[in-house]
Amino acid sequence: MPAIVDVPSGQLVTNDYQRITLDLATEWTALHRPGAPDLYPEPLRAEIDEVMDGIYRDINNGVYKAGFASSQQEYEEAYAALFRRLDLVSARLADRRYLVGDTITEADIRLFTTLVRFDPVYHGHFKCNRNKLTEDPVLWAYARDLYQTPGFGDTVDFDHIKRHYYQVHTGINPTAIVPAGPDLSGWTAPHHREQLGGRPFGDGTPPGPVPEGERVTPPASR
């Protein structure tokens, strides 16, 4: 469970995972770096909230509903809702680079966190297997676009993602065997989404280089 903790006192500040990132974007601006992009612009908040609501219910949480379903009906309902929403999102992104407006917003970040795990984990481990992310041309290009944007792919550790799910969820994967695949080298392939326009960071600037101790090896180099 994500949480913000006051380190000196050890006191929990908040564990409201739905609000933490929004609070960071709106209430903690004094701690933002110079040039930090506005990921939750006030004129677009109603639309962002609406988009995020569907993404959370059917995609972010939907994969877990399918993966931890206790009955066939429960699984099939979650499965259907997941792919119905993914189809809607794919259609929305067919002619626009980002989910809301022409810059990256909180909605894109929340969708990315599930898309980046989809083929390595959710497709097999959670039985969300109608199709792979790589088989949806729009979502696959969109995910690669974000992955190749500073602040996204340079923080993704696919090896850790796979080990976490396959070794921790012993009720689903009792052998704790971690799959060798899938091939992840495609994440660095050209996406051509820049042709749709948009300004990734809006009036802000990209983040600086990842600190040496936090750098992740790109999949193509593994």
Please annotate each region the language model reported.
Residues 1-222:
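C-terminal alpha-helical interaction module
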